Amino acid sequence: FNSNSLKKYSVIIGIGGNIGNTKKIFDKLILCLKKDSRFTLLITSPLLKNPPFGFLEQSDFLNGIIRLKTNLCPNSFLKAMQRYENKFGRKRSFQDAPRTLDIDIIFFENKKINTKNLIIPHKNWANRESVIIPLKRMNNNGKKSKLKCM
């Protein structure tokens, strides 16, 4: 019996970070997501190194994309992702600040949500190379893609 069939929502998240050993943090996040019964990981993108935007006086970011399945509703999924950000040391000091781990919900099934706490699809996804390029590479690499540094 395929556990994917039990999870009804397909979700694409963007991950990014520029504090500490970002690659190691991403690897640990992926292990946590794989162990978490609320999620089934489907595919990950290659990583992309990007310059910061907004606040420019900081290190470049590593970014990637993860596609997974879940039964959580969008708000519960958001809370779960925020808990993972906190687990890996995310501090919210100011907008576009350096961070250990940033998790953005890019798409949640084909839902459109616009609330104070949650906007899906992510409002800036189409303007961000940090989303577009890994998404294209993930889609071109087939099902066996692994999150890896370029």
Regions found by a protein language model. Give the residues of each.
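Nucleotide and nucleotide-moiety/phosphate-recognizing core
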Residues: 3-15, 19-93, 109-110
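Flexible, gly/pro- and Lys/Arg-enriched active-site loops
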Residues: 1, 51-61, 72-150
